[in-house]
């Protein structure tokens, strides 16, 4: 897909992030297992009903990286753009996945997602994510009300 003329949004940021992942599989072989969960999007009623019967669940994050690193058993990324905020169901999913050992975050750009994944991949032993490698251009904070890292 040529993104040159596409309006920038959550989908374009996610496409750019996944393109980066595919391009860096030689450097980080575990990236071959990162994938998008197609829960969102506009669908007609018939398709939505079929997907619901197939197990689509509201709130499940956009991206799953089922590779253990540091003290975590896997990683979930919820992509957002602009002023969009995660839904109640999305926040609930992220908090519950954190409780069972996943690293979870909300990223507002492809760059933020790349930095988070790079830090995650490079964790050693039982290290935790700190956001220390994100640099000055990106802010890493745990949202007070949500209790989830926002990058």
Language-model segment annotations:
Residues 1-151:
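Catalytic phosphate/metal-binding cores of nucleic-acid and nucleotide-processing enzymes, i.e., regions
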